Amino acid sequence: MAPAKKREKDSNPDGSAANGIIGLTHGAPDASNAGSTVPPTAEGQVKLNGHQQEQELFLQAFEKPTQIYRYLRNRHETNPIFLNRTLSYMKERMSRNNKKRISFQVNSMLESITQKSEAVSQNYLHVIYDSLHEKLPARLDNESGEDLLQEQLLCEAGESVSVETTLYKITRSKRKDSTLDFQELLSKCSQIVYNPKDRVGEHATISIPLQTMRPMGEQHTLYKLLFRIKVLSPSTCNDENAETPPNKRSRPNEKMFGSELILYEKSSGFITEGEYEAMLQPLNSTSIKSFSPKKCTWETMPDSYIPLSLTYDVYQQSPMLKFHLTLSNEQLPEMISAPELQRYVQHLDAVAEMNYNNNNYNNNNNCSGLKNGSGGGNSTVCKTTPEHIQIVYNFMYSNNTRQQTEYTQELNCPWCGLDCLRLYALLKHLKLCHARFNFTYQPAGSGARIDVTINDAYDGSYAGSPYDLAGPSGSSFARTCGPVRRTSVTSLMVCRPRRQKTCLDEFLELDEDEISNQRSYITGHNRLYHHTETCLPVHPKELDIDSEGESDPLWLRQKTIQMIDEFSDVNEGEKELMKLWNLHVMRHGFVGDCQLPIACEMFLDAKGTEIVRKNLYRNFILHMCSLFDYGLIAAETVYKTVQKLQGLLSKYAAGQELMQRQREEQLKYWLDVGMHKKQEDPKTLKSPQKPAPPADQASTSSASTSGSGSGSSSMQPPKRMPAHLKRGSAASSPGVQSKGTENGTNGSNSSSSNSKNVAKKSADQPLSTLANTRERRSEYGQKRNVSGSRLAATPASKRKLSSKDNTVLNKRQRYSDGSPGTGIGNGHGGGSGSGANRNKSNNHSLPATSNNASSSSSNSKRAIARRRSTSERTKASGSTGGGAGGVRTRLSVPAKYERR
């Protein structure tokens, strides 16, 4: 057994004075223990301690659920989760019926609104006084009792009393506001009868224009009606001059009573028409100042003030002022007769049916609506009378009764104080709303006994949405946060069986099936998810974002962009491309090299247009080449990606113009500033005063000094230039060509040095002086003498070729020279030999210098010789037929070696 909780106990040994449960009375103590004066024995002391421990365990078991339900009661009163009148077993609490739904028509909506507007659009608010009533206390037999009775009454019955009615306007002031907080709008005095013996013949009226109670826009304005009654002591009440203000000596005999009524408030609107009773309370001379919040003090409250919460029959102990409130278009006279009052009262009954403002009751008014008042309206009071049954609660623990309440006829719930009006509704409420206990109904004669035990099978876990508990404290069940997203329910199974008739037999025994077969009717993921990285709960508004895909939150993207901007060793274009690429990889979470091809494709789909627009075309191509160099993507991927980017560029006209403009700017930069800037001759820079020698002198001097300087020239290779420039320079130097033809039999050293010097000097000549080398390729392939006959090219003029080109040239030379079976060299030996030499010189020899002294006749002779050799070769090939070796075919050779 668990140890008993230490409590402060009284001298009563059975613990009957311990704290009770829910404020109910304890059972009677044991009479034998209470009446025994002899000290108990050891066995009796042990039994007594065991009983106290069981009592402590009983109190501990019932204490926690009771505190929980007490807290839920307070919360449900201020912020209810549901309305009890909507429950099927609480039909008696539903004061409204749905009979009007049968005869409801859409066309009637306009009529009802019109009637409502007509009823509200009145011009005057009338206060019709009835009388002033005060309950007479029980009379005493002696004379002192008569005197005490006269002192307690305001005045003698049937006397007239003056009532001062004042209308005040209270405005919530702000800083630097010129309007008054407290303003008096209207004040009138009327005569009413105090405790009339017979029926009142005339009634005093006050008409208040509604124009004086206009709301001031959004400013909080309150209109309050104050009733004050001044009466004198009985010694001066019958005086003829009672209405005049008393002198200073009689002022202590003056009494003042007052009450207030709120006519208009911004939150509730105008007060409802009806019959009212205002409870009057004693006031002193400074009570009127209590209306101002700045002047409100505790001293203004009278000593005889009785709060409403302390006295139940406070309306019976204070004077009551009866009056009517009506609305009409006409102003009433100051006094009306009783028959006219009945006519206005009937008007109130007719207007009450069209009144829809049912919630204008204000607890600040010390008034109680009796007929068509604030508690009335079109609501219908339930006609069912509450049951009168003697009910007792029996609290049991360990199958033993530990505490029992007194018999009561109230059908209120002991934990939440709800008036259930019927025994069946009470038992149903206890079973469904207080599931921490088990309730068993036992008939007991004309009453009922309800056994209360602890529900050990109660699941204390939260059965609602787990997201309510994950939110901030205080906002889980808040109703002021507005509409928020909630978790979606996969499927909702609704079972609405046929309702059976209510019977108390269902509470006789516990339902074992309901305890064992408890299951949720809501299916789906009724659980709480958490973020992977932060382990924080995922709120319903974050369910669309996958927790695993949170690799690029906003703060991380901003931090990445900031870090890239801080780089100093890359240009702006590379920075922009790095931002786009890094954010793209972070967003999609590419983790492997095999995903890079699809990453490049997705990158172009998402950022292709932006790449062209930001002029990042070359940066992206360089990035693709870098990926290829590191082996991350294949060449096919590079080709497809660039081709796709070209396709995007072809459809983007603005991008094409931008690329063209940027290309022109880049070329201009290269030619003006970059590596392709035109540089001057270094020799000219060394000796700017010495003029450059002519081309023929330079070539002559270089040819004469080539023999002596061959060793130095071999150590310093000449400046290499394209072949077409070398051939063009050779054609544009006539002096050098003539000297080369006359000295054709010189050594190889002199000829090679001569050609090098000519190539060097010809590079500086303008392109306009260069001849077309295609026409001279075959003509100047061999050197010619003065007579115009062709000479074999010198070995020094041959160009070094690769092995592949040499193989092709050898095959062609073999076919052109007349290999075995061709028959070309038999009949035309000289022609074939010269043709072979010509083919060799035309294909793999450098162009020799042409003789500038040859005339036009020599040119025509060379053309005739070419045609003659061509015709002879054609005849020879045609005469040799039949043999396989005699068939001559033309092999495909590279274009640069092909004969022009």
Swiss-Prot record:
Residues 820-834 have a biased composition (Gly residues). InterPro entries: Polycomb_protein_VEFS-Box. Residues 1-44, 678-900 are annotated as: Disordered. It holds the Pfam family VEFS-Box. GO terms for molecular function: chromatin DNA binding; DNA binding; zinc ion binding. Disulfide bonds: none annotated. Component of the polycomb repressive complex 2 (PRC2, also known as the Esc/E(Z) complex), composed of Caf1-55, esc, E(z), Su(z)12, and possibly pho. PRC2 associates with the accessory components Jarid2 and jing to form the PRC2 Jarid2-jing variant (PRC2.2). PRC2 may also associate with Pcl and HDAC1/Rpd3 during early embryogenesis. This complex is distinct from the PRC1 complex, which contains many other PcG proteins like Pc, Ph, Psc, Su(z)2. The two complexes however cooperate and interact together during the first 3 hours of development to establish PcG silencing. Polycomb group (PcG) protein. While PcG proteins are generally required to maintain the transcriptionally repressive state of homeotic genes throughout development, this protein is specifically required during the first 6 hours of embryogenesis to establish the repressed state. Component of the Esc/E(z) complex, which methylates 'Lys-9' (H3K9me) and 'Lys-27' (H3K27me) of histone H3, leading to transcriptional repression of the affected target gene. This is Polycomb protein Su(z)12.
